[in-house]
Amino acid sequence: MEKKLRQLKNDNLLRKLRNTSIDKGHIIISQKKHLNLSSNDYLGINLGMINYSQMQSSSRLISGNDSNFEKLEKLLSKHKSQEKSIVYPTGYMANLGAITSIVEKNDFVFSDELNHVSIIEACKLSGAKIKIYKHNDAEDLKKKLNKTNGRKFIITEGVFSMDGDIANLKEITNISANNNSILILDDAHGDFVFGRNGRGTGDVLGVNKKIDVYISSLSKGLGSFGGYISSQKSVVDLCINQSRSFIYTSALPASIINFSIKRLNMNREKRRKKLWKNIKAFHKGLENIGFVTKSSSQIIPIMIGNEKKAMDFGKFLLSKNIFAQPIRFPTVKKGSARIRMSITAWHTKKEIDYALEVLEKAGRRFQII
C-alpha cells in the first residue's frame, strides 16, 4: 500500500483532504478566505439553518418514509412533467439504482465515453452488454445501434461534469426513437440551471417529451441534498421494488426533505438569471484573454494536460485567493489534467473580473495562453 501511495505521489496523482468551510461564494481554508470557483451551488441559494429531525428510523420501505417524501416527489414529477418520481439519498445512488433496476443482463447499453463514473459503475453492475460511443458523436452512436439486435438503452449526461459541454440531445433523441431504444438522461448539472424555470437540458433543447428516464441531483442547482429519478409510473415502481441503493439504505432526514420542498417552492428565476449573466461574462472574459474552451455551461475547464503543471497552476490560483481544483487521472484521462471551475450566482462582477485577471496571469505564467 505504501508503494502505491508513493507511486501516486510521484505521478502527481495523490489526493489529500483539506479542512474547509463555506461562506456564500467563498471558501475558508486555514482561516483564510478565497473566492470559490469549485462550488456546485450554482444558483447560490444554500443558506440558513435546517430545522426538523436529523435522522429517519430506517429505510423508506420499513419505517423511514416521512410523509413529506410524497410531497417532494410530486413536485419533482411536476418539474419534469413525468408521472412519478422517487428520491434517493444521493445522485450517485440514483444512477446505480435506476440503471440496475431497468437494465437487464441480455440488454445492450450505449454509453457516452465521458459519462460520469456512477453511470459507468451502474452499467457494469447491471450485467448488460456495454457499448461505448464516441463523446457526443451521434453518427458513432447510430452505427453502433444499427449493428445490434436486442433491447437497447442509451445513457448520456445532459451537461458533462468535467467538460461543461451539452449533450447533442436533439440528434440523440431522434436516433433513440428511430431505433426503438430507451433513453436515460443524467441531468445532474443541467437540472434547475437550463430551460424554462430550470427544467433542464431536455427543456432548453425542446426534447423533454422524448426522454424516457430522468436521473438528477438535488445537491447542485437546487442547493439541497439527494438525488432522484422521474419517469413513467411503471419505471419508478420497478426501481422502488428492485433498486438496492433505495431498498437497503436509511432514508434521507426529514430536515433535508423539507429543505428541498422549500427550495422547489421558492422563486429561483432571479438567481438563475444572475447565474447566466455571470456565466456569459466569464466565458466572454476567458475568450478575450485567449483561453479556448468547449464549455457552454457553468462548468468551465481550463485544459492543462500535464498533471504537475495542473497542480502548480492550482497552487498559483490559491496563492491569489482563488480556489479552483485541479482535476487529474483517474477522473479524466492521463495527460488531460485541467482546472475545473464552476460559476455560481454568488459571484459578483468584481469577483469575476478579479478571477479573470488572475487567470490571465496564470495562463501566461504556465504558457497555456
Place the predicted regions along the sequence by residue:
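PLP-dependent enzyme catalytic core of the Aspartate aminotransferase-like
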Residues: G48, K74, K78, S319-K320, ...
